[in-house]
Amino acid sequence: MSPSTLHQGAAKGFADAATYDAYRPSYSSEATQKFLSHLRLADVPHARVLDLAAGTGKMTEVLAARHEGFEIVAVEPHEGMRAELEKKELPGVEVKDGFAAKLPLGEEWADGAIVAQAFHWFATPEALKEIHRVLKPTAVLGVIWNIEEYNKPQHWEASTPWENALNELVFSLGSDGQPRFRNFVWKDVFDNQLDSNPLRAVRDVIMEGGRKMPLFSVPVGEEKVPFTVWLTPEALWNRLRTLSQIAVLEGDAASAFKEKFDAIVAGESVERNEKGEVLLHGVTYLAWTSRL
């Protein structure tokens, strides 16, 4: 799938933009501050920020509410999501249609670029080249995801047996050929910038008579910020079904998945409070890399 066209899985899986906006979580002040510090944007007045694949504006809202007074261009190709974002009329935010490989910005416009909850959809050399074009020299590209444990990569350890079971249920859907954060292949686009191991010293590579050099620094920086949240089983289900691979389930497949979900959430290892809410664990995953 070209990064200059809307991925079919995203177009269908996120068709209900209002539900996505209602049930997807925002970003904590702790995670946001750490993230912006890594991007060298924290406390920088009026910095120009590209919010790429802004969706319904979960991250855009957080950025617009901060004290820096960022000048934000929020780029989103999904018409329904972009409409939800435009309704919010956020201060300092200009909303534009566009794709990762064809950004509606001039060269070296941005002091920093942010991709929240979406980089796995367009982790391609073409997208990196275009992001590199619009960033100022040495500016930082940051990618961020809220990852509940049901959506984590399988090599990450779960906090509880029931969350591990829910994670296994999500993985039982198998691969539909669509890119997912939990498959953890999005990092390859950075590591594969060179034909040799990116952790070794950069070597010359003969490529059409020139040097093939990386566009962004490697290895990427990484940090996890843990979080917990109490949710009713219904709210947990509503959040879970905002995942595109679950949102597209229909008929018997949807019913069978929901039955398995209900059985897991009714399990003995689930911690509940007096309101009947269950305790859900997750991390906000941060990664960043500098434009070279």
Predicted regions and their residues:
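Conserved Class I S-adenosyl-L-methionine
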Residues: 193-292
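Class I SAM-dependent methyltransferase Rossmann-like catalytic core
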Residues: 10-27
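A short SAM/SAH-binding and catalytic strip from SAM-dependent methyltransferases
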Residues: 111-125
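A short acidic, Gly/Pro-enriched loop at the edge of an enzyme's catalytic core
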Residues: 101-112
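Conserved catalytic/acceptor-binding region of the Class I
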Residues: 137-229
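Class I SAM-dependent methyltransferase SAM/SAH-binding core
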Residues: 48-102
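Conserved alpha-helix/loop element of class I SAM-dependent methyltransferases that forms part
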Residues: 25-46
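A short glycine-rich, Lys/Arg-flanked "PGG" loop and its adjoining helix->strand segment in the class I
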Residues: 126-137
